Amino acid sequence: MQPEYRIVQNIKKLIRSRGGWCVKIHGGPYQDAGTPDILACYKGRFIAIEVKTSRGVARPEQKVTQRAITGSGGYALITHLIGDVADVLDAIDEL
């Protein structure tokens, strides 16, 4: 199992290596609850990624945010696998 920060770093490297933009969001008292860990743009598409360790569980507000993003036409996922992010990037490539 990789620590969450290492998973985040690997996901950021993947997105950037494919020409995308991304930023790690650091939560705090002024941050909306449920804001994903990584916000990205890839080929004009908005992607929000909540990173968990393999034992991590999404909080209810994270699930609400995920539904709001997908309902607005963006891509949102909660994952601990870099392969899940690669799958989203591949799907965007095929649009």
Regions found by a protein language model. Give the residues of each.
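Catalytic phosphate/metal-binding cores of nucleic-acid and nucleotide-processing enzymes, i.e., regions
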Residues: 1-95
